[in-house]
Amino acid sequence: MERRSFLKKASVGLAAGAAAGVASTAAVAAPAVQTGLPEIKWRMTSSFPKSIDTLYGSAELLANRLREITGGKFDIRIFPAGEIVPGLQALDAVQQGTVEMCHSCSYYYVGKDKTFAFGTAVPFGMNARQMDAWIIGGGGQELLDEFYGNYNVYSFLGGNTGVQMGGWYRKQINTLEDIKGLKIRIAGIAGEIMSRMGAIPQQIAGSDIYPSLEKGTIDAAEWVAPYDDEKLGFYKVAPHYPTTTRRAGGSRARWCTSM
């Protein structure tokens, strides 16, 4: 199954479960519309640019699905990164009540607490299927609920990216010496590992990566995988794309709402 299809179906199924309280998938063509519901209008800020139709598109599918199965009673308006708040401040926007919901990757916030990484991915950790097993059947969601409760936020699954690549580089990387002093956009604990190898990790939102590479502000960038990376045009300014590095076996995006 294509990753794009899986991510979108995961979002649709999640939406149906959240709103209707029943198991559902994207294959259900005409779900029963719930009646007698209050009108709810939420705003969701995304950490992703609108051009990424897998990540940003999954948020649109969620909103459309909820709108459909509630007869328009539950309406979520989605805003791309930078429109309300910068992409890396999505969680803060929920905490502060600026928006009711966000779609983000929790490892963007390891600067607050490294535990946030376990909601998305850690280097050499679980792949997407193992993450699902842990979160859904292994007590992972309960542990994350307890952790996120400290931030007055509730978080739940929002699709996954699948295996991620090693990043795009302006120069070829052949030895560890080539990594020393390298300014690379990379998120989560992986950035800390790169730092110990001599690189200089940078936290940059997705929509700002291309101009940073083009101007030489950074020397390399890790984002997602070929389909998403091509959308942002990294290959035009950073032609080296090694596949020998496997950092994240299945990064999890997450929906976060205020408690």
Where are these regions (language model features)?
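N-terminal secretory/targeting leader peptides
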Residues: 2-131, 143-259
